Design a protein with these regions (language model features):
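Structured, active/binding-site neighborhoods that engage oxygen-rich ligands
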Residues: 1-201
Length: 201
């Protein structure tokens, strides 16, 4: 299932039209060709839950295949989100320790990426403010919000929300509930986090 929203709006539709017009992969989906706004939309991580589920306990293969899949239409942080989420899902079959899951996810993405930076920032905020999830949401809105990134659904703010939901939710119902209350891409974040927490339960 892909979002068909027209050229320069929907990542998948734009890449499809690039391919149809004779621009071969991987140039058809590259940030150099399409710009970071398109290459780093949230779609890179929201369609890859399956890889974590078919590689239970094997985050390396889950991250690799999720990255390959996401690379059809995304680049850079769009790929890192695919690797991070799928690795977390796969590792959840081994442990339900949220901090360990986050560390595993981080081990499959570049440590100097913006994606890794938002994950670490939310983890640090939670360590210092472990009780009130809304304070973390306010922190994300002020420091990692949509106003800082191009397009209508960038992966970075939503990655922050996903990590916040894992850390503050701590169980399936709360994590999904907090997701729908947090705004931004509520259904996608609930889907990713719901998969992780669903396996963990």
């Amino acid at each position: 299932m892909f979002w068909w929203g027209d050229y320069s709006v929907s990542t998948e539709h734009m890449v499809y039209l690039n391919l149809k017009n004779g621009i071969p992969a991987p140039r058809s989906d590259s940030a150099e060709m399409n710009g970071l706004t398109i290459a780093e939309k949230i779609d890179g991580q929201i369609f890859i839950d399956t890889w974590g589920l078919i590689f239970p306990g094997d985050p390396a293969n889950a991250a690799e295949d999720a990255t390959i899949t996401a690379s059809v239409s995304h680049d850079k942080n769009g790929l890192y989100g695919a690797a991070f989420i799928s690795a977390c899902i796969a590792q959840t079959f081994v442990t339900n320790d949220i901090d360990e899951l986050i560390d595993i996810g981080l081990s499959f993405i570049p440590s100097d990426s913006t994606y890794a930076a938002v994950v670490r920032a939310v983890s640090k905020f939670h360590a210092q403010n472990p009780d009130i999830w809304r304070s973390c949401l306010e922190y994300l809105q002020q420091n990692w919000g949509y106003d800082r990134y191009g397009g209508n659904c960038h992966i970075i703010p939503n990655a922050g929300v996903c990590v916040m939901l894992l850390l503050y939710g701590r169980n399936y119902p709360r994590a999904v509930e907090f997701s729908t209350m947090s705004g931004w891409d509520t259904d996608c974040n609930a889907g990713n986090v719901g998969t992780i927490m669903g396996v963990a339960c």
